[in-house]
């Protein structure tokens, strides 16, 4: 078998890896094998954490909405609020509801009371 000299192609590839890993600490930014391993690990972690970020933000929005609802003092929960919202087909997503709850509480309470009234009215009509 003939010998293949990789020359500048290998250097170019390794240089790309080194630029990616330039901010890593110690051997993780200096040794070629550990650079490639750390690159794979970093990319896997970034992919995983991107999905975790979505999950954490959703739980944050739910917590904020629930806190404002329970602050009203009524024995009403987030679960009942979202159920009533879907029952009257008012589709405001959790992100927007959480922002309204934080920035403009009076407006959120207006929405909350409307949803409660509509849901109670529909429930009353269905019973009778």
Swiss-Prot record:
Its main location: plastid. It is found in: Plastid. GO terms for molecular function: rRNA binding; structural constituent of ribosome. GO terms for biological process: translation. The keyword Ribosomal protein applies. Keywords: Plastid, Ribonucleoprotein, Ribosomal protein, RNA-binding, rRNA-binding. InterPro entries: Ribosomal_bL20 (IPR005813), RIBOSOMAL_L20_CS (IPR049946), Ribosomal_protein_bL20_C (IPR035566). GO terms for cellular component: plastid; ribonucleoprotein complex; ribosome. PROSITE patterns: RIBOSOMAL_L20. Pfam families: Ribosomal_L20. Binds directly to 23S ribosomal RNA and is necessary for the in vitro assembly process of the 50S ribosomal subunit. It is not involved in the protein synthesizing functions of that subunit. Belongs to the bacterial ribosomal protein bL20 family. This is Large ribosomal subunit protein bL20c. It comes from Epifagus virginiana (Beechdrops). The gene is rpl20.
């Amino acid at each position: 078998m003939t010998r293949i000299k990789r020359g500048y192609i290998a250097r170019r590839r390794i240089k790309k890896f080194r630029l990616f890993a330039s901010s890593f600490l110690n051997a993780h930014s200096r040794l070629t094998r550990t650079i490639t391993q750390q690159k794979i690990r970093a990319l896997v972690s970034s992919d995983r954490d991107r999905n975790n970020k979505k999950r954490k933000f959703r739980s944050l929005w739910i917590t904020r909405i629930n806190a404002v609802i329970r602050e009203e003092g009524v024995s009403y929960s987030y679960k009942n609020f979202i159920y009533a919202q879907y029952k009257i087909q008012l589709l405001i997503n959790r992100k927007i509801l959480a922002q309204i709850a934080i920035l403009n509480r009076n407006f959120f309470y207006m929405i909350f009371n409307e949803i409660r009234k509509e849901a109670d009215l529909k429930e009353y009509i269905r019973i009778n």
